[in-house]
């Protein structure tokens, strides 16, 4: 079903490698994203998007402000419908799943940590079990074990009885990641999870997400403006610019000039050998 008549001009200038037909991981299949403005018409943010994110890898989505990163992640997470094409997770199209089924396929972490007064970290993490607990929300022994293991994996088990407003920003963000882990989904999507953290906390959270992807063989996809950290920690990059999406490893995208075109300015350049961003003319 294609409810919108989307023109083909302005599609991505350089298709990303891969055919978007993964049976494991996240696949974008000729995806168009945007918003319905009235019946039968839409505001198109980007279209013709083909990309893949693999289990056991940290995939980072980077791009300038306003290019549509959040819109893309919302579409991947099935928080809004695609205008055309589809998103698949482990071979299942997300747009044909029920809300309950989607909640068992993908967990979502947003940049703003939840504002939940009088809520403990343990209670927040337990919310990740909601897709499995039924109408009354009662936790079984298995649910409690899943929550404990999720908190252990991110290093906050000792904080389970602390209130959210009693811990640091980094600890709160780790709690939201633990909630996503407790949800037991094959994919986790995070929209700028380090946006409000100091630099050491940003690095710690990014390194944690990389480890969780590798050890749990999860597909972890996140957006970030911290390109320096993404270059050092991501296995795979999605670079979004001008309505197009290009994918590859940091090394590949540095070698073919994609990252230089994205980064290069009067002040900045990319050192492809070290995958570090350099300031020009600074002594």
Regions found by a protein language model. Give the residues of each.
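The feature captures the beta-strand-to-loop junction immediately N-terminal to the Walker
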Residues: 62-64
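Helix-to-loop junction immediately C-terminal to a conserved catalytic motif
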Residues: 77
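Conserved ABC transporter NBD signature motif
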Residues: 85-93, 102
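Conserved ABC ATPase "signature" region
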Residues: 126, 141-159
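Conserved ABC ATPase signature
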Residues: 163-167
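Catalytic Walker B motif of ABC-type/P-loop ATPase nucleotide-binding domains
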Residues: 188-191
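ABC ATPase nucleotide-binding domains
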Residues: 263-283
């Amino acid at each position: 079903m294609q409810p919108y008549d989307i023109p083909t001009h302005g599609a991505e200038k350089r298709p990303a490698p891969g055919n978007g037909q993964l049976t494991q991981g996240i696949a974008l299949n000729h995806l168009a994203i945007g918003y319905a403005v009235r019946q039968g018409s839409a505001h198109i943010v980007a279209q013709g998007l083909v990309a893949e994110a693999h289990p056991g890898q940290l995939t980072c989505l980077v791009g300038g402000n306003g290019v549509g990163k959040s819109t893309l992640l919302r579409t991947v997470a099935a928080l809004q419908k695609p205008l055309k094409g589809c998103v698949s997770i482990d071979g299942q199209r997300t747009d044909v799943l029920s809300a309950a089924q989607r909640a068992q396929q993908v967990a979502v972490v947003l940049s703003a940590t939840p504002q939940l007064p009088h809520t403990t970290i343990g209670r927040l993490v337990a919310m990740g079990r909601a897709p499995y607990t039924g109408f009354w929300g009662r936790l079984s022994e298995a649910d409690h074990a899943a929550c404990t293991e999720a908190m252990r994996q991110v290093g906050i088990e000792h904080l389970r009885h602390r209130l959210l407003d009693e811990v640091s920003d980094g600890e709160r963000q780790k709690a939201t990641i633990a909630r996503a882990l407790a949800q037991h989904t094959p994919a986790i999507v995070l929209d700028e999870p380090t946006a409000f953290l100091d630099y050491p906390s940003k690095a710690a959270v990014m390194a944690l997400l990389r480890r969780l992807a590798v050890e749990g063989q999860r597909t972890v996809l996140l957006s970030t403006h911290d390109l320096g950290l993404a270059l050092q920690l991501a296995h795979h990059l999605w670079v979004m610019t001008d309505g197009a999406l290009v994918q590859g490893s940091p090394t590949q995208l540095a070698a073919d000039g994609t990252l230089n075109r994205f980064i290069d300015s009067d002040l900045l350049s990319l050192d492809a050998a070290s995958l570090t961003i350099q300031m020009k003319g600074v002594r």
